[in-house]
Amino acid sequence: MPAILEARINKKRLLISTDTKELQIQLINKDIPNVLDSLGLNGKVSYGYIKGKNNYICIDRLEAYIDDYESQNPTKGELLSLIFLKRLVEGGKYGDIEEINYSVFDNFKEISTHLRNVSCDPNMCRPKKCKKDCLYKNRIEELKEEHITVVNHSLLAKWPYKDEKPLENIIVDEAHNLTEKGYDFFSSIINSKSLRYLLQEIYPYEFIQNSSFIYKKYSRNMRKIKAFDKFYNVLKIEREDKQKIARSINLIIEEIDSILNFGNCNEYNNVSNYNLRWELNLQIDEIVGKLKKDGVDTEISYRAYSEKIKLSCEKIIKNLVSIIIIIYRNIDDDSIDKEADIYKFGKAKTRDLEDIKIIFEIFLEYDEKDDYARIVEIDKNYNDFEFRVVPLKIADLFEENILSQLEKGIFLSATLSLSESMSYFKNTLGIDRVKNVEKIIEPIFDYKNRVSVVGFSDICEYRNSEFPNEMSKIISNISKITEGHTLALFNSKDRQEKTYEILKKYLHSFNLEIYADKKGIRHLNDLNRKCVVLGSKGCFEGVDIPGDGLVCVTLDKLPNLNPKDPLYFTIMKKYSIDYYTINYPQMTIKVKQAMGRILRSKYDYGCFVIFDVGTNLSVLKRLEKDLHDCKISKVNSNEFYTYIRRHLNKSRSLILKSVIFDTIKALNVDAKMDNNDVDKDIIKKDINENIRQRAVKGEVYHIDIIKKDMKVKYFDRNYLINLDIFMREEDKN
């Protein structure tokens, strides 16, 4: 509403930033239209959303791709999927890859491969010069006049559309995510798969037979002349130099493979079931795990792997330099048309190579006093790796890239404050350095009475192998009491998958549905279905199920940071910050987000169950204050079911009173009965429809017009309500 009023009254153009693309879509399809409708401003305030270039189909690339495919004997499935894409983008209304319905991917198996080859190339796509009628170009044009543009935080951090829409007035929703994801936004990343793809793009066509790329399953596309080959021709690079480039690329690929093979063929392959993650220098002697050698437990550290990575990176840098030198030797020739598209494309790709070289160089630098973490992550199956250079002082970068450009900024979230202060949020992002006003709004919901927070005193801790079994039994018993409508959240994907496999056997025997991921969320809205949804970190926010659709949220454990997490380990080490200071804000934000799934509207209530709350009483006491003074009750598993039944019955009694009062008022039932101006069957039907619209399962099954009595069934309880007495008492309240 503030954005709409500011746009309408003061003629301001604003950005609204959300955490995810799903929330973008919710704002565009639901929230903004509803507010405009309620204010009578439909058609008077323009709005839309935009994503990064690579989220859109490029018509030029699609047409070239189709032409190439026609000469390569494509299969029927490949042709049909290409025809679908061609028709999709006609007219410039469609072309957002993420908006393609999942059923399309089910019916056209080849479409994912096609989309990788036809999305907008950031180096080639220049909307101002594009003559095609494409969605992305149209959206860029609309930005110039659009009142409200919705983006996600990732795009906001690097906002590439400053010419069309400057960063002057922004509203940031779910702003708490910036404190954690800010490190990702400003990181420099080398991903081995992305690097391979870039090297594949620049590999000279005439020597492709000597490369490893020719043996890939998609080698058909490697046997064609690529755009970069045309760039080589524009630069008049000699065959001998192209051969040197090919040789350097081969050597880089060898080093990429050797980094992965080092782990796969050595002792590291047997010490962990998870991705290997460590800070290249500060955790070099951290223990990965133990192996038995000659009957003796031997500790394995990251030292050997770190040394191998450093050696390979030095060789990769050397070969990148060799490629860049050859290209730049010819790039400034006066005879070259520097305005040609192919020249600009090639130069941009060469700059990408330079950027990668610089990241490798910074990754290898080591200074205990600098403000970076150098993080290695190796895929557990040794198929991929990622090197990250992460800036630790994101306040400087946030101020430079965002705050310094703002006229006004509003940062919103239900979880910005900790211990009744926003200091953590403001200090992390540098907002404390600029003029700001802090406003903490008291919650509109009665958390203490509507939400019961429960932990267990007698089940095993999360590290125990029996933990998924114990959780599954409890969740299945909860689901019988709640008739489904339960969301089980997990900090660990592995634990989520194990629990799903156990829990589905219990639930199927009770005729309860179970869904393994967030795709099942929409089924919770159907009050006639009895379902349980398991979700990971993506479900901690953005889940909005009103009323009886969601009455229980469970959490496997308090989401504490791993003290050996490379980023936070580095922060603690370099700045002498203790674990509690680092962990508590992050943990509390996540718990508040999880609990916040329950109370979303006037008729919401429920139980928030944390299976492993830990043993630190001082942390739990502080957490209670941050959970709106909700007491965390630790009970044994035998008492638990009586405890939640009592809470649910008490809450439902309050909900029923509220929904009946609002329904009677909305339909003017009291006055109609007084005037004897009502058919009891019609009014009963109208009341029940109104109650269901409020996402409540209560049902009026009998009405006595003369006595003004109603009999209502709500779950397993029946209520007799006399409207005269009821409305009089509720009006007093």
Predicted regions and their residues:
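A substrate-engagement module of RecA-like helicase motors
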Residues: 11-14, 18-147, 207-243, 250, ...
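Conserved RecA-like ASCE P-loop NTPase motor core of nucleic-acid helicases/translocases
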Residues: 13-20, 410-412, 484-491, 495
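A contiguous, basic/glycine-rich beta-loop/short-helix subdomain that forms a polymer-engagement track
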Residues: 122-146, 157-160, 313-454, 517-518, ...
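N-terminal targeting/trafficking signals and adjacent low-complexity tails
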Residues: 609, 613-663, 670
